[in-house]
Structures are given as structure tokens and as C-alpha cells.
Amino acid sequence: MSTFIQIPNSISQLTSKSKLEEIFTYAAIRSQIKDGNLQAAFPQNQLTELVGVNDRSIRNYIDTLENFGLIINTTKKHGYGEYAHNVYQLEYLNKEYFIMNPSLITEQGISPKLKGLLMLIKANCVKGTNYLEFNSK
């Protein structure tokens, strides 16, 4: 697992009502990348616990993230068919991303919605800084 988590700045362009939870869900999935292959396995029941919503909401968030092109829900052949096993293929980020400390994912004193808001603010900051341009006119 890497020291920091890369989050694309494009995540700020999500438009749904639950975009803060979707941003946090994406970061939680991305935090599970191991050995640099850009695949993350995260059981849905653990994800629902972490985000604090029901299974249906998590499925909706993942569908939104897939439609936005941030994750690919991979399926594996098993027995007589193909099944999704909560393994997600993530894109390689070579520019236009920010990094965050993975301890934010497991921080107990902050709600998932507030964590998503913090990431949304960071995605809109000037690249490489914590400076948010604001024009008062």
C-alpha cells in the first residue's frame, strides 16, 4: 500500500446530490490498492460500514463512479458464469491529481460526508498548494 492516496482533481466535477459520499467512497476504494497494479479489492459490507450508508447507496455510488470513468468494476469467471467480486480497476494518474494521507479514511472523529467535503475543497485548490482561489467580484 502506498504512503499517500492519489485522488484525481476531476472528482470535483461529480454532480449528484450525494457527491461528498461518492468522493469518500472513491478515496476508500483507492486506499486499498496494493502492489502497484491499480486494482483494489474492498468487500461491500466493509465499505458500507466505513461510509455509513446502506448497500443500495453504495451500489449507486459505485455505478456513478463507473459512469464517470473513475473505476471499472471487474468481473471474474467463476464456475458457470461471471461474477463481480468487488475488485475495482483504477486508472493511473499521471497529472491533475492531489495526494492525501490515508489516515483520513479511518479517522473516527470526522463524518464521511465531511471527509468528502475536505477532498472536494482540496480538488479545487491551486495545484500543489492548499490555496483556494476566490474572486469576490
Where is each model-derived feature located?
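Short recognition helix of helix-turn-helix/winged-helix DNA-binding domains
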Residues: 1-50, 66-72, 78-136
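Short, hydrophobic-biased segments on the C-terminal half of alpha helices
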Residues: 59-63
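A generic structural-conservation signal
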Residues: 57, 74-75
